[in-house]
Regions:
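Radical SAM/AdoMet-radical enzyme domain recognition
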Residues: 61-79, 87-209
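Cysteine-centered iron-sulfur cluster-binding motifs in ferredoxin-type domains/subunits
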Residues: 33-40, 83, 325-330, 336-337
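Radical SAM enzyme [4Fe-4S]-AdoMet core and its adjacent flexible, acidic
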Residues: 141, 149-157, 161, 165-309
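Secreted/processed peptides and extracellular or luminal domains of membrane proteins
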Residues: 43, 47-50, 262, 336-339, ...
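Flexible mid-to-C-terminal extensions adjoining Fe-S/redox cofactors in radical SAM and related proteins
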Residues: 2-25, 278-365
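Canonical Radical SAM [4Fe-4S] cluster-binding loop centered on the CxxxCxxC motif
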Residues: 21-60
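Short, solvent-exposed loop/turn segments at secondary-structure boundaries
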Residues: 54-57, 144-147, 220
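Short Fe-S-cluster ligation motifs
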Residues: 66-85, 303, 355-365
Length: 365
């Protein structure tokens, strides 16, 4: 077994909340390859499509190889950004990742191109073994409205059905869905779960929308209040049996708002990192620490010399440090060490009333 195949650290299997582990960066590498997208989601964080296109069109296969070889602790690679299945070299990149020894070769996708079974098979044969399909409603009316793409739901479901059919040949395949929870779909959690039952999905990940990109620009219309999301998810989970509860997970919501939920269904967004050209980070780097700096462990300039571009190494925590805030009262919360804070835009709009520090658990005698 090579070094990349070591067990992931910082996970619990005892029914408690998953822990984040010690690393500020994590062991999941996101490789951004999708310079275009065939959906047009109303809440998309990548709202500057022209800049994304220019940035990723300049990225070469050799650049991608260097990204996947720089950090020896990376044991999971996820191809993402835009719609990666539209990239002509995606299968080649997956073969490259497999040959480099990554035990998990993953894909974050809208699932539409997986509706073509020969293409889905090609990716699986290239080494793909973890697929995260973004699907945001129980039917075409809701999903297609949010993606602003007619027929997107039908194709995404067909893609999931193809993956289900191929699992006999590729038994290591794990399939998850990603449902971006917002004000327009928060009321359809159970309907979505029931609609997905025939597709043999391993886990349904419900990510609360970030008030960033298009979501931030149309926040009053799209952003569901955290308290309403927590209440809706609590009602949803209460109606599931044990097997159903084991398949659902709510992410990207402050811990203090979800104390009524069972611990195993709430957690954190897994730490990961990616590379992008120096100076092209899309978040406000001056919005975080008082001195405007972001810790060097989270944002390392000139980490890779590409063939024509020099790349920075950017951890998910850099975005959090720039976009999220805490108040002094947070230091008294039992979740302070785990919590990344609340989006600045959210508290500027609605204040701090929802966020009540949780008393740390009393020590066991």
């Amino acid at each position: 077994m090579n070094d990349r195949a070591r067990d992931l650290q910082g996970r619990t299997n005892d029914g408690g909340m998953p822990a984040q582990g010690a690393s500020a960066v994590g062991n999941r590498l996101h490789v951004c390859v999708g310079y275009s997208c065939n959906n047009n989601c109303v809440f998309c964080m990548e709202d500057d499509r022209e800049a994304r296109y220019a940035r990723l069109r300049a990225q070469t296969p050799e650049d991608v190889r260097r990204m996947m070889t720089l950090d020896p602790d990376a044991r999971e690679v996820m191809f993402t950004s835009g719609e990666p299945t539209l990239h002509p070299h995606l299968a080649d990149y997956m073969r490259m990742a497999r040959d480099l020894g990554f035990p998990t070769v993953g894909l974050i996708t809208n699932g539409r191109r997986l509706a073509y079974k020969p293409y889905a098979r090609e990716l699986l044969e290239a080494g793909l073994n973890h697929v995260l399909v973004s699907i945001h409603g129980p039917n075409g009316k809701i999903h297609d409205m949010l993606t602003r793409s007619r027929g997107a739901f039908v194709q995404a479901v067909a893609g999931l059905a193809n993956l289900a059919a191929l699992r006999n040949e590729f038994p290591d395949l794990k399939v998850h869905t990603s449902y971006v929870v917002n004000a327009l779909n928060v009321g359809y959690l159970r309907e979505f779960f029931d609609a997905m039952r025939p597709l043999h999905v391993d886990q349904h990940v419900f990510n609360v929308m970030m008030p960033d990109g298009r979501g931030g620009a149309d926040m009053d219309h799209l952003m569901a209040r955290y308290r309403d999301v927590a209440a809706a998810f609590q009602a949803f989970v209460a109606g599931l049996d044990g097997d159903g509860r084991a398949k659902v997970f709510l992410l990207d919501i402050p811990y203090c708002t979800t104390t009524a939920l069972p611990d195993p269904v709430r957690g954190y967004v897994e730490r990961y990192f990616h590379y992008e050209p120096d100076g092209s980070t899309t978040f406000r780097q001056d919005a975080g620490a008082a001195d405007g700096a972001i810790d060097a462990d989270l944002l390392q300039a000139s980490a890779i010399d590409g063939e024509t571009v020099t790349y920075s190494k950017v951890a998910k925590g850099a975005h959090d440090a720039a976009m999220r805030v805490k108040r002094p009262e947070c230091a008294a919360c039992g979740f302070d060490d785990l919590c990344r804070g609340v989006f600045r835009q959210y508290v500027e709009r609605w204040g701090w009333d929802e966020f009540v520090p949780v008393r740390p658990a009393d020590p066991v005698p």
